[in-house]
Each structure stands twice: as structure tokens, then as C-alpha cells.
Amino acid sequence: MKRLLFLFLLAGILINNHALQHNETIDLKKLAKIVLPPAYQTRVIGGRVTTNAKLGGYLVAMRYFNNFICGGTLIHELIVLTAAHCFEDRAEKEAWSVDGGISRLSEKGIRRQVKRFIKSAQFKMVTMNMDVAVVLLNRPMVGKNIGTLSLCSTALTPGQTMDVSGWGMTNPDDEGPGHMLRTVSVPVIEKRICREAYRESVSISDSMFCASVLGKKDACTYDSGGPLVYEKQVCGIVSFGIGCASRRYPGVYTDVHYVKPFIVKGIKALLSRSR
């Protein structure tokens, strides 16, 4: 936690200097929502209400001590794909549970316990590089309004439009998750533009890409770990951002196609140990 507080202070200094140079004001309360748990999570802004059934049943809600923390994607009846940062300071696997087949957080769907999880050894909160984790459930997630997605098969291209869904905040000033499932379509932003936007605060690595309609459509707090979907494939994992639907900073996602070798290896390791 001390390391995260240091990161918050460092980010505040860097971004505040950037703001002074551009005559801007930085809201440190909103910044804390992005840098410190539980808000290293994101939400859908500018979207529409939907249901898990309409989406295909692949979106799951991940809870820690029964508190909603992150979204996730069911990619196998026993495996969930999510963000590594969701597990930061939340290492007790017995305290994690996963709800499937729900559209409202208050609904009772199909609940499974987390048996194991693997996150990339390259992941560090200070860089957010390789923000990816795979989760093994204690029993298969099957039933009504439950489905799976395949992993992204092709590299992303700028302008490509994808759908992001989740229970995240719908307003940057909110204090908790939204209870209704929402979805929004966002385009992939050119990597050069993405890196330029974040150059004063964080390095955009090869494992990341940006997507949003600046100032209008984005993921936000509590959407973290959820999927960015293209043609029934999960191509992105909601990772982080500065603010939500910011005019300057687009949302940042983990590139599933880039991290696919880690995902495939992790799935094999988890399933081999589950037998």
C-alpha cells in the first residue's frame, strides 16, 4: 500500500507539472480513483443499458469478500480472463468469488469460487505493463445466460470499433459501481497518439493500446478487468486511465492479441493442475 501511495504522489507531481504548463487544473480526488485501489478500475460512460443475455453471457462480476471489484471474461467454462491489477493487495484466493449470468449486481446468478489465479510476472502497478491474469474456477460456469468468448485472433488497427461493457461508474464523480450493466462502442486510437497523451505520466508499452471517443465515450472505475469485444472475440482488457471520458486521456487496455502467449500458457497450467 505504501508503494501505491508513493505512486499516487509521484503521479500527482508529474501530472500537476503537466497541468501547470498547460494552464489546467488536476482533480487529485479523481486521480486517486485511478491510481489507488479499489479504483484502479474503470466504468462505461456514454453507453446504453444492456443485459448479459444480449451480450452473449460472457461477462462476469468478480467479488472479493463479496464486494464487487472487477469485471472479467469467461473464455472457458472454468477460466476467466481479467486484469492483474484487480488482485493487487487482494491475494487471498479463498475470498474471491465470480458471478455469471447477471445483468444487475444485485441479482443472484451462478456463483463460483476462485480456485487459483495466475497473473503475469512482468506486471507491476508502477508501470501497468502486462496487466493480465487468468483465473481458475472451482466448478464449471454453465447455465442460463452464460457463454464464452474466444481470444483475439488478429492484431488491432486504428479506427477499429469495439464494444466495452461493465458495471462501472457512469459519472466521474460517482463513488461506487453502477448497478445496471452498460455497453458502449469505442474506436482504437493510434498508438502514437496514445503515447503522446500519456507521455508525462506513464509509458504506453507494447502490451497496451488506447480506445475511446475523447470527452464522450469510455470505460471507467469498476469496469476494470472487463472485455473489449470485436466480432465475438475478446481483444482488450480494461486496464487504466486518467479520469473517465477525458478530453485529453483515452482509456488504456491490455492488448489480448499481444499477451495471448501468456494467456494460453496460463490456461494450460491452470487446467492441468485442476485434474
Curated annotation (Swiss-Prot):
Disruption phenotype: RNAi-mediated knockdown in males results in a number of effects in females mated with these males including impaired processing of the metalloprotease Semp1 and the accessory gland proteins Acp26Aa and Acp36DE, lower levels of egg laying after the first day post-mating, higher rates of sexual receptivity to subsequent males and failure to release stored sperm from the female seminal receptacle. SUPFAM superfamilies: Trypsin-like serine proteases. It is found in: Secreted. PROSITE patterns: TRYPSIN_DOM, TRYPSIN_HIS. Produced in the male accessory glands and secreted into seminal fluid. Glycans are attached at N23. SMART domains: Tryp_SPc. It is an enzyme of class 3 (hydrolase). Keywords: Disulfide bond, Glycoprotein, Hydrolase, Protease, Secreted, Serine protease, Signal, Zymogen. One of its GO terms (biological process) is zymogen activation. Its main location: secreted. It holds the Pfam family Trypsin. Undergoes cleavage in the male during mating with a cleaved product detected in the ejaculatory duct and/or bulb of males by 8-10 minutes after the start of mating. Further cleavage occurs in the mated female. Residues 44-268 form the Peptidase S1 domain. This is Seminase. The lineage of its organism: Eukaryota, Metazoa, Ecdysozoa, Arthropoda, Hexapoda.
